[in-house]
Structure formats: C-alpha cells, structure tokens
C-alpha cells in the first residue's frame, strides 16, 4: 500500500529486532487487533472507522437503475475506493498508484459482493426493467496500515446501517416515497464478512516455508504502516461469524503451508466475532437513539397542533 515511503536502516533494524524479542512499537501482542472505533453519521449509510491512526469513511447510496440482461431478477451493487492525498505524504501530488486502489477494491469486492453478503435479489423492483443500484464509496483519510481490514468493516457497517426509500409500483410507474412520509427500508444482509490481515517476517533472510525447519518466521496481525513496509509476506483472510471462510488472498511473499493457513483462520475468528458483535451493538444503540429522537419530535408536533 505504501511502496514509495522510505524507512531508515536504523529504524528498520530496531523494528525487526523488537519483533525478534516479541515486542511491537505500539505495545500490542502479535495476535492483537487494534481497537476499532465505528461512528455513524446523521444520514443512513454514513460510517467512519478508525483503527489506531488509520481512518476510513464509507458512504452508501442508492438509485433506481436497469438490471443486467443476464440477471433480470437482481439489483446492482458497486464498491468504489479512493485514496485521498490527505491519507499520507506518500499520496500527495497525485502520487497514488492504481495498484493500491485496485488491490484493496478487489479484495473488498470478493469479500462483500461476490460472497453474497448483500441480498441483491431483494433489490429487484420490476424484473428485467427496474432495480435498486446500491453503491459503496470508500475514502481513505489517514494511512497507518490496515486499509483493507478497515474498509471491509466500514462497508459492512454502512450496508447494515443504510436504508433505502420505500416505493410503490403501479404498473410501469414507480413512486419513491420521501423518508419523512414513509419509514425507509433496510437492506437484506445475509452474512457479515470481516477481513483480517496477517503480516509475515523472515528475520533470518533464509527463504523457506512459513514455520519451516528453523521455525524462525514471525507472524503478526493488523500491521501498522512501518510494519507493512518491512514485511516479507502478507495474507488476508475473510470470515464470518458462522466460521465460513469467505476468501483468502495472498499476494506473493513467503510460501505458506496448509497448517499455517488453518492456524491464521482460527486466530482471525475470535477477532471477527468481536468486531461483528461490536457492529451489531452500535447499530442497536443508533436505532434506539433515532427512535427516541423521532418520538420527541412527534410529541412536540402534537403539542403545537
């Protein structure tokens, strides 16, 4: 994600030596995920996610469109990612490589869209003619590693928070009701995939399988930006609370055996379970807050009448 950043030899040596002695610069253990802060905006589908110094914003929107000819009973779902120049000095002056956005967008798309997390059949209005087109716009605001994990959390939280306008169909006429007239309708979410990224280090500079004969390779969860710059391999796994492996992405680096992959999936599950529960709890609190505000507004209007 940040190939153009240079890190000094002394700092690189210090970080790797700390890892050899089971220490990380931010004080976390190797299997510890950063605390995730999820904030919902005033509008449905407006979500900000903060992991350490990494900040991601996601905005879910929808409009009526025409479905694909080969999928007349399904709606449309598109994910768009954009790295803002304010995300870090490495992205200033338009120095944003297409590979960064494509890699992140591809993994998020496999994790969310292709896994069927969103019920696209529920977006159909008139088969073969009209459907809802849902769009997730992800903006990276601050970069300190973990972009993929943070953006996946933001997209799923946004989809679960978003509500589309209610509609009435009379023949070929479609009436879209304003939110202040009719209660908007939530999207159909079939499961909640969450990404967890593992970074691998080879301090001995000897190429072999991860956890090979010397057993010297180091693996950590949720690397910071500086740790990402020094890693020798990376693995992103996506699971849901049902213990289903949604996708596995490994873009080169140190070779890996099946046992290590199984171990990573097992470690990721406890993190995914915690984040899923956190999203559900925050959604519940946000719904209660909105209902309370709506009740107060209704009572005030009744008094005025």
Swiss-Prot record:
Component of the RNA exosome complex. Specifically part of the catalytically inactive RNA exosome core complex (Exo-9) which may associate with the catalytic subunits RRP6 and DIS3 in cytoplasmic- and nuclear-specific RNA exosome complex forms. Exo-9 is formed by a hexameric base ring of RNase PH domain-containing subunits and a cap ring consisting of CSL4, RRP4 and RRP40. Interacts with LRP1. This is Exosome complex component RRP45. Keywords: Cytoplasm, Exosome, Nucleus, RNA-binding, rRNA processing. Non-catalytic component of the RNA exosome complex which has 3'->5' exoribonuclease activity and participates in a multitude of cellular RNA processing and degradation events. In the nucleus, the RNA exosome complex is involved in proper maturation of stable RNA species such as rRNA, snRNA and snoRNA, in the elimination of RNA processing by-products and non-coding 'pervasive' transcripts, such as antisense RNA species and cryptic unstable transcripts (CUTs), and of mRNAs with processing defects, thereby limiting or excluding their export to the cytoplasm. The gene is RRP45. Its main location: cytoplasm. InterPro entries: ExoRNase_PH_dom1 (IPR001247), ExoRNase_PH_dom2 (IPR015847), ExoRNase_PH_dom2_sf (IPR036345), Exosome_comp_Rrp42_subfam (IPR050590), PNPase/RNase_PH_dom_sf (IPR027408), Ribosomal_Su5_D2-typ_SF (IPR020568), Rrp45 (IPR033100). GO terms for molecular function: mRNA 3'-UTR AU-rich region binding. Present with 4800 molecules/cell in log phase SD medium. One of its GO terms (cellular component) is nuclear exosome (RNase complex). It is found in: Cytoplasm; Nucleus, Nucleolus. One of its GO terms (biological process) is rRNA catabolic process. Belongs to the RNase PH family.
């Amino acid at each position: 994600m940040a190939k153009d950043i240079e890190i000094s030899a002394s700092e690189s040596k210090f970080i790797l030596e700390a890892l050899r002695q089971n220490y990380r610069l931010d004080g976390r253990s190797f299997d510890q995920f950063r605390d995730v802060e999820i904030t919902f905006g005033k509008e449905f589908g407006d979500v900000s996610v903060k992991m350490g110094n990494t900040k991601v914003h996601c905005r879910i929107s929808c409009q009526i469109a025409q479905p694909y000819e080969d999928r007349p009973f399904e709606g449309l779902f598109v994910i768009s990612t954009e790295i803002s120049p304010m995300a870090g000095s490495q992205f200033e002056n338009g120095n944003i490589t297409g590979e960064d956005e494509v890699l992140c967008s591809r993994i998020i798309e496999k994790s969310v869209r292709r896994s069927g997390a969103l019920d696209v059949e529920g977006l159909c209005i008139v088969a073969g003619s009209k459907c809802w087109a849902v769009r997730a716009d992800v903006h990276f605001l601050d970069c300190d590693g973990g972009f993929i994990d943070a953006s996946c959390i933001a997209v799923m939280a946004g989809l679960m928070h978003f509500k589309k306008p209610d509609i009435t169909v009379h023949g070929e006429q479609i009436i879209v009701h304003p939110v202040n007239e009719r209660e908007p309708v939530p999207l159909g979410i079939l499961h909640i995939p969450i990404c967890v990224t593992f970074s691998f280090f080879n301090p001995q500079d000897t190429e072999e399988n991860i956890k090979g004969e010397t057993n010297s390779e180091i693996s950590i969860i949720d690397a910071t930006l500086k740790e990402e710059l020094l890693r020798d391999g990376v693995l992103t796994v996506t699971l849901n609370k049902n213990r289903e492996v949604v996708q596995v992405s490994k873009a080169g680096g140190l070779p890996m055996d099946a046992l290590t992959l199984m171990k990573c999936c097992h470690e990721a599950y406890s993190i995914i379970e915690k984040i899923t529960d956190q999203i559900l709890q925050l959604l519940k609190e946000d719904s209660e807050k909105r209902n309370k505000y709506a009740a107060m507004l209704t009572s005030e209007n009744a008094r005025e009448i």
